[in-house]
């Protein structure tokens, strides 16, 4: 029987309007101090793990009570996740740390259907959440009372400099006709959902960034893990699961010449990735984080539409902000370019500061615009990059089975999520009696759709894809039995 353990902490809010405070994220002018109250559900007599699979916090924002539901991001690390640094004599030192009991969560705000959250619970709560259309940041306060946290909007953080920060990508597709055609296709809401894709990510940290954080590997690791957790959350609406495969820190020297010209650095990094990094471990996309100030106020650069290419599936990003969230947005932006997304056209896209905006904004969004979604859908249709089709093997994702993490793990028949799921039993992650399926383009009300039912409309020369009548999956290229 599940009992609710209530950790009672005095719930208080002290808005310091007009005051200024220096946080890890920078100098903040307008913020609230909150004392979250934690509610967690554990089986009677169970030993509480350091980081629970699911947690709930209650606090107030602008005088209104909010309930933050969090679930551990179980798919964040591959089973063979590795970390590499280098000794003074140049030896490569690679370790395979245990990351099963990590502290990175995603979630939502209760009774806010449009809400999202990406939170690190390593030392208090740090990250962001979206509430009633606004993005808020939360982080612990360094006070004698360790439970105190600051909640604030990103635009209330003082700018670190006045120069506009922008992506250096200027190339465009030769024509946008395919984009227009893709957006005009008639698809049912179910068919419009993006197919599940999986990206195994490699992060490389250059020597300049390593020394920027006092040559402290633990600080680098924590910062990168928070970034990847944020990227994972931002990619979820596109049905993309991000898994961190490796972290390579150039602790003694750079292995390429990191230059002020971002495209040149990306080219050199792509060469090194093809020659060296891919031979260490298989992955789909790599990004170089650097402390270098790129020319022309550029903070990132990536090749357009080159996902899965051994040389060109790369991006370079300046560690341009003390705020993890902002650097993570830039990393997601460059990943978006690799997935075929161009910059948002301010006259055509109904999003002032979405992820693919060419210039970073004071009111930066964590969302992809409709334009970006159209570009991505067209890229999948026209290019169908093969490396991101494969789900991690059930033994490749570090986790014990837990519902709602978007990975089908060992022992699971379905990823159940909510206890109200009519097809999947949330307690066992098994299909309910009489159910054939729980999700998929060929699943309808827990049953396989009839044979030959169209599950994906024809694109170009490709025929309609049709259900087999024996699976919830929609096979490619009209292959049905």
Curated annotation (Swiss-Prot):
The active site is at residue 334. It holds the Pfam family Reprolysin. GO terms for molecular function: metal ion binding; metalloendopeptidase activity; toxin activity. Keywords: Cell adhesion impairing toxin, Disulfide bond, Hemostasis impairing toxin, Hydrolase, Metal-binding, Metalloprotease, Platelet aggregation inhibiting toxin, Protease, Secreted, Signal, Toxin, Zinc, Zymogen. Its cofactor is Zn(2+). Monomer. Belongs to the venom metalloproteinase (M12B) family. P-II subfamily. P-IIa sub-subfamily. This is Zinc metalloproteinase/disintegrin. It comes from Protobothrops elegans.
């Amino acid at each position: 029987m599940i009992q609710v353990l209530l950790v009672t902490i005095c719930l208080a809010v002290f808005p310091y309007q007009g005051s200024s405070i220096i946080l890890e994220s920078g100098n903040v002018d307008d913020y609230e101090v909150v004392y979250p109250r934690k509610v967690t559900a554990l089986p009677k007599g169970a030993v509480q793990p350091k980081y629970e699979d699911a947690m709930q916090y209650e606090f107030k924002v602008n005088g209104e009570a909010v309930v933050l539901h969090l679930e551990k991001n179980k798919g964040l690390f591959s089973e063979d996740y590795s970390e590499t640094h280098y000794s003074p004599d140049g030896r490569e030192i690679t370790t395979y740390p245990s990351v099963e009991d990590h502290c990175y969560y995603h979630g939502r705000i209760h009774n806010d259907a449009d809400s999202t959250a990406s939170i690190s619970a390593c030392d208090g709560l740090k990250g962001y959440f979206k509430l009633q259309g606004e993005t808020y940041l939360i982080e612990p306060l360094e006070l004698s009372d360790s439970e105190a946290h600051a909640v604030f909007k990103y635009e209330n953080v003082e700018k670190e400099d006045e120069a506009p920060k922008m992506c250096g990508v200027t190339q465009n597709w030769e024509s946008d006709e395919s984009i227009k055609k893709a957006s005009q296709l008639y698809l049912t809401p179910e068919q419009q959902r993006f197919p599940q894709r999986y990206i195994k990510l490699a992060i490389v940290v250059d020597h300049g960034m390593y020394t920027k954080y006092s040559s402290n590997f633990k600080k680098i690791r924590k910062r990168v893990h928070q970034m990847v957790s944020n990227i994972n959350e931002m990619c979820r609406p596109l049905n993309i699961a991000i898994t961190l495969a490796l972290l390579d820190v150039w602790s003694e020297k750079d292995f390429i010449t990191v230059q002020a010209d971002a495209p040149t650095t990306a080219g050199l990094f792509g060469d090194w990735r093809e020659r060296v990094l891919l031979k260490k471990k298989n992955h789909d996309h790599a990004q170089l984080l650097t402390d270098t100030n790129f020319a022309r106020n550029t903070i990132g650069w990536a090749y357009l539409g080159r996902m899965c290419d051994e040389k060109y599936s790369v991006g370079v990003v300046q560690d341009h902000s003390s705020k993890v969230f902002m650097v993570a947005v830039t990393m997601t932006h460059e990943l978006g370019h690799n997935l075929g997304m161009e910059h948002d056209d301010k006259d055509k896209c109904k999003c002032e500061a979405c992820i693919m905006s060419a210039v970073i904004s004071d009111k930066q969004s964590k969302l992809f615009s409709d334009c970006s979604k159209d570009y991505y859908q067209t890229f999948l249709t026209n290019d169908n990059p093969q490396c991101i089709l494969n789900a991690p093997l059930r033994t490749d994702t570090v986790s014990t089975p837990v519902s709602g993490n978007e990975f089908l793990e060992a022992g699971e028949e379905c990823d159940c999520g909510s206890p109200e799921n009519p097809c999947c039993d949330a307690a066992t992650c098994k299909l309910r009696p009489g159910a054939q399926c729980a999700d998929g383009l060929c699943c309808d009300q827990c049953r396989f759709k009839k044979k030959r039912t169209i599950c994906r409309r024809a694109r170009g020369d490709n025929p309609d894809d049709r259900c087999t009548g024996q699976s919830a999956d929609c096979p490619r290229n009209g292959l049905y039995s």
